[in-house]
């Protein structure tokens, strides 16, 4: 049972956009004045806001995250070529990091209106009256939005609060027409959680085999409008995103290395994706992180500052809006080094908000203490408390899917899969779990195809290689996103089955995969017959003739193998046999056996 106690207070006056010094270039079209104050605008004329401000801002154009990451990597490679100094060691200093993660919940409805939560539709097509803060409209909490939030909290071992409340966080900006954001500052719905980071998660070496990170609280809050900057300080606003439900996850400052901080964000994203709580990951803008960074001298007395109940810390700074795991790690490194340099020079650290640009080597100041906003938190008088029944919590706990740690152990230990540590980790992290689901489908189909071969299936590792590396390589080369329908699981399983039965060669299997990937609608069996890909092994005599030919052409390398024991060069000879013979008929293992026999036998 989820119940929202309604407030009896009347409508609370909203700030008009005009009071904030902005201009409506084109008004919203409104055809009805229904007292409920809720409406889906999908059937209304398209409405847009053109907001002009007098505040000068940068005119940088929007750059997709994928391109930003490529530019960041390019900048770092350029810095290395210039002979940049190796990273400094700071053994005398203790770094402390706390993280705040904002994640978009995967829901159909908005948090406080019945409008659709879809944000990729036509701009301003999913907008209720409350979303744009029209006078008289009131928030209407949608209980369904709480379900993914509860799954996220339970997955991170939080204590669910039976009663939670919403508060107003006041600030003025064009993306928030009400003049405040609704959040849960005082009484969040979840507290006192924790996650466990292990070595395979990518934590720092000094953290040993594992480290536990506390979760102070998780709170629900509404998202803001999406703004697009145009020349002449003009902004276009899309209110489809307003009131889309978010959760903010606040960790305790128990992280002491940049690598572990990045691993923490990565692990939280994996947890959220595994329980279906979020829409997309960091790479698509579904998550963003703020980090709080402080340092203190190990040899000196504890610092004077306290943060979330942990005392003895140095003065912290906050770095806002980090959009990738690499950005989290690099920004912390840069800010740590900056703070240490300031303190070693006799200066002091100011509590301030700082920013980070992809590819940069240092953080930049956004605002200091004097510029900090007084948010004037207050309970929202239009929203009553949210009461969560024990039956809801128990039901969600019973239906909880496997979490990343359990998935990892299953993939590396279950004989059905037996993936390497690296492949298991990658499989879990890719494509919001869709790649893992596809992999498991291929394995299950392949098991059905190979019931006649052996009672003990051992093809899971081979399937992992094909899903991650062969199919993944085609996706990367073509710059296409993941789509399980491009190569159906049945088709890939049939290709791997033919290869394991030695009915086709490895090169033929890759050709088959490429043809299916490119849209060939024929069945795998039909392609094999039409393209004459079925493997016809060479006779022993043919193998010997080819081996003797490549040995005759390369006597020096034969001598090096015989006299110096450079057996690794036999692989090169196998490649030459494939080159001068029919590659689709050459079996690498048999070719190597013949070569070893001829080269080493004559040596003895």
UniProtKB/Swiss-Prot annotation:
Q: Which Gene3D superfamilies match?
A: 1.10.10.410
Task: Tell me which Gene Ontology terms the entry assigns under biological process.
Answer: glutaminyl-tRNAGln biosynthesis via transamidation; mitochondrial translation
Keyword match Mitochondrion: yes
Q: Where is the transit peptide?
A: 1-48
Q: Which GO terms describe its cellular component?
A: glutamyl-tRNA(Gln) amidotransferase complex; mitochondrion
Instruction: Write down the chemical reaction(s) this protein catalyses.
Output: L-glutamyl-tRNA(Gln) + L-glutamine + ATP + H2O = L-glutaminyl-tRNA(Gln) + L-glutamate + ADP + phosphate + H(+)
Q: Tell me the disulfide pairings in this chain.
A: none
Keywords, A to Z, come to: ATP-binding, Ligase, Mitochondrion, Nucleotide-binding, Protein biosynthesis, Transit peptide
**Where do the segments described as Disordered lie?**
28-57
As for subcellular location, the record says: Mitochondrion
Q: What Enzyme Commission number does this protein have?
A: 6.3.5.-
Which GO terms of the molecular function aspect are on file? ATP binding; glutaminyl-tRNA synthase (glutamine-hydrolyzing) activity
Polar residues bias located where? 33-46
Pfam families linked: GatB_N (PF02934), GatB_Yqey (PF02637)
Q: Which InterPro entries match?
A: Asn/Gln-tRNA_amidoTrfase_suB/E, Asn/Gln-tRNA_Trfase_suB/E_cat, Asn/Gln_amidotransferase, Asn/Gln_tRNA_amidoTrase-B-like, GatB, GatB_Yqey_C_2, Gln-tRNA_amidoTrfase_suB_CS, Gln_synth/guanido_kin_cat_dom
Q: Which PROSITE patterns match?
A: GATB (PS01234)
Q: Does the keyword Ligase apply?
A: yes
Q: In UniProt terms, what function does this protein have?
A: Allows the formation of correctly charged Gln-tRNA(Gln) through the transamidation of misacylated Glu-tRNA(Gln) in the mitochondria. The reaction takes place in the presence of glutamine and ATP through an activated gamma-phospho-Glu-tRNA(Gln).
Q: Whom does it interact with, and what assembly results? A: Subunit of the heterotrimeric GatCAB amidotransferase (AdT) complex, composed of A, B and C subunits.
Family stated for the protein in its record = Belongs to the GatB/GatE family. GatB subfamily.
- Tell me the protein's name: Glutamyl-tRNA(Gln) amidotransferase subunit B, mitochondrial
